[in-house]
């Protein structure tokens, strides 16, 4: 997504978006281990940078801050995701700046975070995790305190409209309006962002 971008569907609900202008995946992990993904700081054209802006993927409120300058932003209302109309939480970590205070509110598209190298980190990056929920008052963490409650694959929580896909990995990233794969379907040959969409987005003038 782009700075100050707001994407609202025809029913009035926001669309959950990838929160940066460029996606450059740090490590392409096996699918069973990708509830948390790391992204490197790059410009909208894919060039290295420092302190890459991170925009609110939806209008929401900070509901948690903790170690590694991490924080959780929760949507104020249900938003469109590839999994349906859900409440969404996103955990981000490692900014060099202190996270926003709990109860801080951010409009979709507003910058609320940056990449960094703070805490348990091995180079500047953005660590990010998503959870999708039906109940906005649900617990924040899984039993044992590791991992977001309701955690999910990132491509099941957001869309990548208006994001430059420099290194997206081989995952099912979708544009809003596309149909997610059928659960249980053999997607090995289909896995990955469609080449024709990727090519069109790479050629798009920014």
Predicted regions and their residues:
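Acidic, glycine-anchored pre-beta loop/turn
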Residues: 99-110
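Short alpha-helix capping/helix-loop boundary micro-motifs
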Residues: 46-49, 96-100
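Short peripheral tails and domain-boundary helices/loops at the edges of structured domains
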Residues: 131-168
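Surface-exposed, glycine-biased beta-strand/turn segments
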Residues: 1-74, 78-81, 107-108, 117, ...
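Histidine-centered catalytic micro-motifs
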Residues: 123-131
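Enriched but not universal
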Residues: 188-206
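A short macromolecule-binding patch
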Residues: 84-93
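Conserved positions in beta-strands of structured domains
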Residues: 61-63, 93-96
């Amino acid at each position: 997504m782009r700075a100050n971008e707001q994407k609202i569907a025809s029913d009035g609900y926001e669309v959950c978006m990838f929160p940066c202008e460029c996606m450059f995946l740090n490590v392409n992990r096996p699918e069973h281990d990708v509830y948390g993904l790391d992204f490197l700081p790059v410009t909208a054209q894919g060039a290295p940078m420092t302190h890459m802006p991170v925009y609110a993927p939806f209008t929401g409120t900070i509901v948690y801050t903790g170690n590694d300058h991490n924080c959780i932003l929760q949507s104020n209302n249900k938003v469109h995701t590839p999994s349906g109309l859900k409440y969404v939480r996103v955990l981000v970590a490692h900014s060099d700046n202190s996270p926003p205070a709990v109860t801080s509110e951010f409009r979709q598209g507003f910058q609320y975070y940056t990449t960094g190298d703070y805490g348990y980190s091995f180079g500047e990056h953005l660590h990010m995790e998503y959870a999708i929920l039906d109940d906005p008052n649900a617990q924040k963490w899984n039993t044992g305190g590791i991992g977001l409650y309701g955690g999910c694959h990132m491509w099941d929580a957001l869309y990548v409209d208006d994001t430059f896909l420099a290194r997206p990995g081989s995952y099912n990233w979708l544009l809003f309006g596309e149909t997610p794969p059928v659960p249980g379907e053999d997607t090995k040959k289909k896995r990955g962002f469609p080449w024709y969409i990727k090519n069109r987005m790479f050629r798009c003038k920014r």
